[in-house]
């Protein structure tokens, strides 16, 4: 069995043009099939790190590889297929007249034949339990349904890594549960950026805490969330009365 990780970040450092240093030698490895939560306060460098994973940001020190393929100019088309990012607001990536056309957009843009596009659309919508919505306008769906369709737009590209930005935000309890059920069933590597610590515990056995542009903790989610001093140092808070050791 291959030991090549889905995602490898090695000594990644990055400064913006204004001189702000956002990352200081970040190391991160996600093995195939892992679901990992990326935790940290605002301004920790989480977004900067995520934007390196598919080559939107580059130019600093270190390297990023996706399933062994370096994130470099010559590989960007394939890298962006392999790393699918689902934004916090699903309306940022749903812009076609129907759900089916939104999910088909990526495969069509990659020049896949129409029978393959149709198969991928059907498979991706089935994976997020939205198979009956292909002909519906996205704006007729609930927020939670639109978020699941946004996931489907990425799944149709058969990614190696699925990156989720605050996936539980603005969801009601039923929407949280439905999305969790979808994510737990997906056969892809997942990196979940979130402030929702109970959701991280529900979905991810492992968590990485980033603060000040460095990884300050990496380990079992339950153990990290039970460390009150760690949470306090890095401005992470559990809901009142929530005990991660009892869930």
Regions found by a protein language model. Name each.
Residues 39-41:
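The feature captures the beta-strand-to-loop junction immediately N-terminal to the Walker
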Residues 214-237:
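Conserved beta-strand-loop-alpha-helix hinge in the C-terminal portion
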Residues 54:
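Helix-to-loop junction immediately C-terminal to a conserved catalytic motif
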Residues 62-70, 79:
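Conserved ABC transporter NBD signature motif
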Residues 137-141, 145:
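Conserved ABC ATPase signature
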Residues 115-133:
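Conserved ABC ATPase "signature" region
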Residues 162-165:
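Catalytic Walker B motif of ABC-type/P-loop ATPase nucleotide-binding domains
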């Amino acid at each position: 069995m291959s030991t090549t990780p889905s995602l490898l970040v090695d000594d990644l450092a990055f400064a913006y043009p204004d001189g702000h240093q956002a990352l200081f030698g970040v190391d991160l490895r996600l093995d195939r099939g892992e679901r990992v939560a990326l935790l940290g306060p605002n301004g920790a460098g989480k977004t900067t790190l995520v934007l390196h994973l598919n080559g939107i940001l580059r130019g600093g020190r270190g390297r990023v590889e996706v399933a062994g393929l370096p994130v470099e100019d010559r590989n960007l088309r394939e890298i962006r297929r392999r790393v699918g990012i689902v934004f916090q607001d699903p309306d940022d990536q749903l812009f076609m007249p129907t759900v089916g056309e939104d999910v088909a957009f990526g495969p069509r843009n990659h020049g896949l034949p129409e029978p393959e596009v149709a198969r991928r659309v059907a498979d991706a919508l089935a994976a997020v339990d939205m198979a009956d919505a292909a002909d519906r306008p996205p704006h007729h769906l609930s927020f939670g349904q639109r978020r699941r369709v946004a996931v489907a737009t990425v799944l149709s590209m058969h990614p190696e890594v699925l990156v989720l930005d605050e996936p539980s935000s603005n969801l009601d309890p039923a929407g949280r549960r439905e999305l969790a059920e979808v994510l737990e069933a997906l056969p892809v590597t997942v990196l979940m950026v979130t402030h929702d610590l109970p959701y991280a515990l529900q979905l991810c056995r492992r968590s990485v805490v980033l603060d000040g542009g460095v990884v300050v903790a990496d380990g079992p989610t339950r153990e990290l969330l039970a460390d009150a001093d760690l949470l306090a140092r890095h401005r992470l808070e559990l809901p009142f009365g929530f005990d991660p050791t009892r869930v």
